[in-house]
Structures are given as C-alpha cells and as structure tokens.
C-alpha cells in the first residue's frame, strides 16, 4: 500500500507540476503560433511584471502579494497566448486574485481604478474616464471575465512558493550578517522573478543561486554549517544547482554586453507591429478595446493623441511620431540580430532602461543585472568589489531579518553602473537632467509610489532640443487649459456666493425694521421673528381674573412666573391623611404661586379668603390627627 500511495503521489505531482525545461518553454509556448517570437515574449514579460509591481505599490500591497501576482501571470501564459489575451487585463486580474490568496484583500473597484490610472497615467484626460459609470462597468465586467479564465487556466492551484523564505532561513543558519550580501541576494531573487527561471526550478534552487552570486559579487566566502557545505542548507542537488547558476551567469553576461556597447539614440522610430498584434488580434479571448495600444474605440479616441503607456514605457515625440522606448528598442534589437554590421546605428533596450527615472534605481527595479561584474565559473572571482550599487538598493534590513515589504526612498543623485573591469558605464546627474524635462508635469511625484508617476527620462537619449520642444508643446497646452478652467470656475463660485450673501444681508436689514405687531397675523409675526431673530413678545394688556376660567388663570400665572417655595426635607409620611389630602397639603405648602403684576390687586381678596379656608381646614385636620394619636 505504501508503494502504491507513493506512486500515485508522484504521478499527481507530475500531473500538476508547474516546472518545465528551458527547451519546453521556448518550443511549446502558445504565443509562437501567433507570431510572437521568444524575444518579444521576454520583453512583454518584463512589461507585465513591471506593471504588476507599479500597481501593487500604488495599492500598498506587500512584496509577497506582488510576487504571487507575477507567478499567476507566468503560469497563465504557459497555456494561453499573449496575442489573444491582453496582458494589461490579465495582470490586473492576477493582482486582484493574488490579494485574496495572500490574505491581503483589496476592493475590486480600487484595483480597477488604480490599474486603469496606471495604464493611462501619461494621459490624465483618459485616466479620468474610469470615473464614468459606463467605462467603469465595462472594465469591471472585463476583469471578472478574466478572473474566471485565469482560475480555470491555473486549475485553481493557489499553492505558490517563493524563494524569499528559503533565502532568509539559509542566511540565518549560515550566520551571514553582511547587509550588502543580503541586499544583493534579495535583489537577485526579484530579478529572476521576471524571467522563466521560476518556471524551471523550485524556489530553493533560485534562492541558492542568488546567494552564491551575491557572495561572489561581494567577494565573501560562504561559511560551512555543521560540517556541511553551504548549499546543503537549501536541500538542493549539486547538478541542478549548477544548471541554475549557468543560466544566471548567461543572463548577467548578456546584460553586461548590452550596457558595455551603448548605441546612439538619434534615429527615427518605427512602430512596433508585435505590440499592435497583441491588442488587436481578432481571435482575442479577452477583447478590451479600451486597453489596447491602437484602440479605435470612440471612448478612447485616436491612439496617436494619447498613446497608452505601460509601467516601463516612456513616450518620446520625434518628427510628430509617438513611440515608446521598449517597443522601439525591441525592434532595434531584432534588427541588430539580423544585421550585426549595423549595431552602431541601433539603440539597445537596456540603454533606455539604464537611465530610467533620472538615473536612479528604485527599490522595485532592484539592482540591475548589468551592474554585476563578469563572474568566471572557473575562478569565481569578483572583478569589482567596491561597486556602490547596494547603496541605491531599496529593501532594508532589521538586524538579521530581511524585511520583504520595505520600500525605500531615493538615495542620492547619482548611480554608477559598472561593467567589466569596473569601469563606469553611466553617471547620470539629476541636476543636469532637470533642464531637459518640461517645466510643467502632468503626474505628481511621490516617494510612496517610487517614481511611478515620474515623467520619462528617456528623452535624454533623444535630441535634447527637438525632442524636448515637442514634448513640452505636447504637455503644456493641456495643463494650461485645465488650470484656466479651474480658475474661471473658482471666480464664478466666489461671485455667486458673494451675491447670495449680499441679498441675505439686505433682506435682514429690511426685516430688522420695526413693524407693528397689530398689522401682522400670528403666522406672519412668527415667520418675521424667526427670520430676524427670536424676540419674546411682552404682554402689555391686563386680563382680569374674573374673565378667565380656572384653567386659563393657572396657565397665565404659570407663564407669568412660578416661585418655588422652600424645600421640604422632612421624611415623606401620610401623617394619617388620605393620599389625596396629603398630596393637596404638600402642593399647597411647597408651591407658592405669585400672580402677575396686573392681577395682584384683584387676586389679593381671593388669596385672603383662600388662606382662611386653608387655616380652617388645617385646624380640622389637626384635631383629627390629635384624636388619632390619643
């Protein structure tokens, strides 16, 4: 029985395995049938990973939730084509789904609004359309449809493991206290999350490879724990670990070569047909015209007027043509592979990404792979030891515990990226680039969003005169128009309020005049007094007591004034009286009613007679009480 159960368990693991070889991922990708090459798919993978990261930061989601959303997106496109499923929609769905899986729920309405605003952050007019009911309901229905598709595609498998925990546990067991090693290893894990390594190897292999490269980069020897080598702490086999390290080195070397040979940026942009194919495929499973780059929907308008900008795209305008750097550089990269002799006339993708956000490396960009020096597998030496990349990294540490949810701020005006030999590849000064950017910005810069809303700084690669002039002419009229309308509306509101206050003041002045009460009815007088202020009307005429009934006289006297007599502190007792007699006695002895000035003379006779009656009654009561006592 044990053998059969173990066999069934292994078969189930194989059936629901999410790990494939590198050849399987490249050969059997469903996007290949729709004309999307491996390079295109890799570039789009970087786009939706950056988009998920930016939206997650805006929603203040923890790092684990963001990583889970990225893994959901990776697994979805293992079985679905990029050309038939818009990655913006799928990425938004994965964020919403990951927030529920990781017990960090975020309202669907908020996810939709933030994701839509992130997609159209360069075009505030289009981003504000999400507040319209019809646009919002359309996006909501699209996200709910996409959620069902993602759930069925990933087979309702929510068990996702990340390399963060194995990495932290191993560093704690090995006693690694160097913050630089921890930071570089953590950033490596985040970098591999944007590649297919997380679809090829289990998390402990990625954690082990990241720690090894970080130690070699910092020239730190990994210690031995309990008589075992360091990689035993990850429970990994040496042969697969060597394969993981080989792929990591290849990616590092490829990035280093791209940065080592930057190309000039003065060239004409060519539209990227692959991106248009993704959004406009007639066989799309999720049709979302409002999210497509070249949408012809009347709600969005001409795509050239407000081209959709993704989380890692930056718009430049040269010769009246809108083009994003990731698209342009991807087409240039493909052309360079076909024409090696024309490499000097093309611009690489990483040259644009290298100076993104003013040359500053934000926390979620992590330490770029190009900053890692070439690691020789035979010698395992670090070419450059004193490189200052970790200073600009984002994640912070508290003692020995690495906080995966921390978000750091900018850390300086300059960041140097080094290649082979430790030479500086770029030195971007934030002060020198301020003159290139237009003086009026559409987006707001906030430290919490970590440059999510910053203007594109890839203009520095383009012509500093023509490109900046066209960019400024593109931005300034919209901003000035909006400010002008706001000022006009404020003026109208102020004038209307002042006019209303003046009318009210004049009306109160008219109402404040003395108007005889005899000329007004009771309702009119009450209305006048309520509007001008409550004034108690005095009774000037005298009403004779004999003209009033007993109830009327009592009511009048109560209105004219009641004087409370001395307080009776004696204990309450009936004193042998009936209840009615006792109440009458207490009322007469405790309350003294003073008549108004108009009826004092007329009431004096009645009061004297009343006293005589009360005295006689008291005498009778007193005798009866004495008789009862005796």
UniProtKB/Swiss-Prot annotation:
Residues 288-313, 410-439 are annotated as: Disordered. Residues 421-439 have a biased composition (Polar residues). One of its GO terms (biological process) is positive regulation of transcription by RNA polymerase II. Keywords: Cyclin. GO terms for molecular function: cyclin-dependent protein serine/threonine kinase activator activity. GO terms for cellular component: cyclin/CDK positive transcription elongation factor complex; nucleus. Disulfide bonds: none annotated. SUPFAM superfamilies: Cyclin-like. InterPro entries: Cyclin-like_dom (IPR013763), Cyclin-like_sf (IPR036915), Cyclin/Ssn8 (IPR043198), Cyclin_N (IPR006671). Residues 288-297 have a biased composition (Low complexity). The keyword Electron transport does not apply. It holds the Pfam family Cyclin_N. Belongs to the cyclin family. Cyclin T subfamily. This is Cyclin-T1-2. It comes from Oryza sativa subsp. japonica. The gene is CYCT1_2.
């Amino acid at each position: 029985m044990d053998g059969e159960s173990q066999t069934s368990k292994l078969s189930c693991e194989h059936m629901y395995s999410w790990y494939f070889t590198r050849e399987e991922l490249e050969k059997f990708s469903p996007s290949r049938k729709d004309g999307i090459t491996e390079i295109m798919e890799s570039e789009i993978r970087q786009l939706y990973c950056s988009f998920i990261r930016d939206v997650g930061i805006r929603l203040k989601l923890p790092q684990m939730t963001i990583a889970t959303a990225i893994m959901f997106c990776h697994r979805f496109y293992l079985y679905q084509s990029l050309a038939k499923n818009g990655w913006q929609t799928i990425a938004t769905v994965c964020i919403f789904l990951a927030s529920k899986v990781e017990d960090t729920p975020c309202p669907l309405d908020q996810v939709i609004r933030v994701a839509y605003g992130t997609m159209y952050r360069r075009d505030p007019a289009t981003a504000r359309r999400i507040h319209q009911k019809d646009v919002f309901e359309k996006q909501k229905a699209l996200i709910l449809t996409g959620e069902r598709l993602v759930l069925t595609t990933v087979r309702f498998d929510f068990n996702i493991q990340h390399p963060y925990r194995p990495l932290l546990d191993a560093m704690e067991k090995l006693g690694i206290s160097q913050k630089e090693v921890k930071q570089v290893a953590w950033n490596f894990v985040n970098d591999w999350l944007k590649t297919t390594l997380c679809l090829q190897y289990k998390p402990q292999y990625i954690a082990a490879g990241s720690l090894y490269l970080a130690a070699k980069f910092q020239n730190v020897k990994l210690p031995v724990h309990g008589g075992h080598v360091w990689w035993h702490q990850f429970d990994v086999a040496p042969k697969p670990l060597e394969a993981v390290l080989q792929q990591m080195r290849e990616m590092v070397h490829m990035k280093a070569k791209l940065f080592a040979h930057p190309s000039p940026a003065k060239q004409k942009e060519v539209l990227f047909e692959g991106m248009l194919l993704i959004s406009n495929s007639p066989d799309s499973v999720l049709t979302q015209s409002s999210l497509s780059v070249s949408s012809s929907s009347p709600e969005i308008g001409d795509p050239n007027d407000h081209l959709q900008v993704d989380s890692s795209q930056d718009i430049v305008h040269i010769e009246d043509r809108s083009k994003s750097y990731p698209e342009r550089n991807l087409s240039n990269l493909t052309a360079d592979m076909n024409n090696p002799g024309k490499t000097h006339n093309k611009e690489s993708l990483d040259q644009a990404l290298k100076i993104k956000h003013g040359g500053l490396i934000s926390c979620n960009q992590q330490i770029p792979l190009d900053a890692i020096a070439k690691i020789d597998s035979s010698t395992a030496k670090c070419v450059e030891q004193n490189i200052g990349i970790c200073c600009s990294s984002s994640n912070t540490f508290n003692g020995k515990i690495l906080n995966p949810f921390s978000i750091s701020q900018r850390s300086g005006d300059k960041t140097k990226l080094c290649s082979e030999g430790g030479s500086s590849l770029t030195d971007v000064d934030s002060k020198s680039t301020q003159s290139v950017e237009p003086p009026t910005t559409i987006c707001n810069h906030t430290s919490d969003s970590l440059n999510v809303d910053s203007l594109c700084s890839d203009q520095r690669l383009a012509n500093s005169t023509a490109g900046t002039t066209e960019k400024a002419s593109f931005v300034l009229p919209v901003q000035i128009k909006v400010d002008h309308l706001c000022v006009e509306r404020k003026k109208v509101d102020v004038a209307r309020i002042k006019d209303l206050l003046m009318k009210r003041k004049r009306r109160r002045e008219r109402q404040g005049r003395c108007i005889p009460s005899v000329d007004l009815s009771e309702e009119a007088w009450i209305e006048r007094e309520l509007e001008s202020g409550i004034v108690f009307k005095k009774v000037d005429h005298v009403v004779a007591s004999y003209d009033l009934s007993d109830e009327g006289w009592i009511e009048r006297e109560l209105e004219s004034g009641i004087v409370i007599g001395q307080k009776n502190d004696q204990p309450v007792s009936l004193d042998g009286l009936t209840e009615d007699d006792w109440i009458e006695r207490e009322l007469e002895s405790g309350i003294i009613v003073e008549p108004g000035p108009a009826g004092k003379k007329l009431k004096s006779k009645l009061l004297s007679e009343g006293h005589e009656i009360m005295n006689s009654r008291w005498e009778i009561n007193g005798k009866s009480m004495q008789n009862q006592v005796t």
